Amino acid sequence: MATPKVGNKAPVFKGICTGMGSVDLSKLKGKKVVLYFYPKDSTPGCTTEGQNFRDLYKAFKKEGALIFGLSRESLKSHENFKSKQSFPFELISDPDEKICNQYDVIKEKSMYGRKYMGIDRSTFLIDEKGKLVQEWRKVKVTGHAQEVLDTIKAMK
């Protein structure tokens, strides 16, 4: 799968998610979309990242932006994670990695000398016309949600 390019149309997807049941990117035209990919529910870095987006949610909403978190975890796992952390946004479940592959976020990783394929923490900003306007790869959690918000504010 080719890596999506900033300036081009964002890869369109349909997926299952918390709350709404399903999400179809093509039906979200007219809204800015923040799509953040994270490795695993209820782990320290992923929890902090979600909390940071949660804490800035009202500011994102004021800018007309929807936030979606996405990982390979099950919908049940996402529902528990969302509830426990009081996330006001939806989490997309991608167990077959279809959306992950469209956005080219599955990468070889290493932990304790063991190599495996996993989600490379990444965020994509999609404008109201469905165009990919910014991407962040190999995201460091600290300050990231604020950086995404600042980028949206600068789009005006």
Spell out what each predicted region is.
Residues M1-K156:
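Chalcogenol-based redox active-site neighborhoods
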